Amino acid sequence: MQTAYFSGGCFWCVEAIFQRIVGIIKLTSGYCNGNTSNPTYQDICLGVTGHAEVVKIEFDEFKISFKVLLDIFFEIHNPTTLNQQGNDRGTQYRSAIFYINNKQQLQAINMINLMSDNIVTQVTKLDCFYPAEDYHQNYFNNNLSKPYCQMLIRPKLDKYFSQ
């Protein structure tokens, strides 16, 4: 089993798509690489802790590669907007790949180098990860009728999986 950490805006959207990908074993929404220990969602929303909203992806490398995960990651968010995805604004929503080894770092950098010059995605060593509160886990599946899920997450799922 391997692990990847991606920040591409609100973790609810990122989680919802990766939940539907073959080879994914477990997903955990959380916060990483900030300047405080054990942050809460309220802390993150203030935008002063330095943490990013991330999804920790545990995957079977025999069924899906890190490179394929990178391909999906870059398809499901806008890597050219600094600290913003749609209406979500702030450093917690930055586009970032938090690598755990040199191979992941090199694959991420190589992929970005093949893309346009406008990519703002950070490639940063993972320093720390804190799981988000329980109500953030499996958010879309647990809250299908909520307006955010219907207006933002559902269309992203439909768009990605209709390709």
UniProtKB/Swiss-Prot annotation:
It catalyses: L-methionyl-[protein] + [thioredoxin]-disulfide + H2O = L-methionyl-(S)-S-oxide-[protein] + [thioredoxin]-dithiol; [thioredoxin]-disulfide + L-methionine + H2O = L-methionine (S)-S-oxide + [thioredoxin]-dithiol. GO terms for biological process: protein modification process. It holds the Pfam family PMSR. Gene3D superfamilies: Peptide methionine sulphoxide reductase MsrA (3.30.1060.10). Belongs to the MsrA Met sulfoxide reductase family. Coiled coil: none annotated. One of its GO terms (molecular function) is L-methionine:thioredoxin-disulfide S-oxidoreductase activity. Keywords: Oxidoreductase. The keyword Phosphoprotein does not apply. Its EC number is 1.8.4.11. It is an enzyme of class 1 (oxidoreductase). This is Peptide methionine sulfoxide reductase MsrA. Has an important function as a repair enzyme for proteins that have been inactivated by oxidation. Catalyzes the reversible oxidation-reduction of methionine sulfoxide in proteins to methionine. It comes from Vesicomyosocius okutanii subsp. Calyptogena okutanii (strain HA). The keyword Nucleus does not apply. The active site is at residue 10.
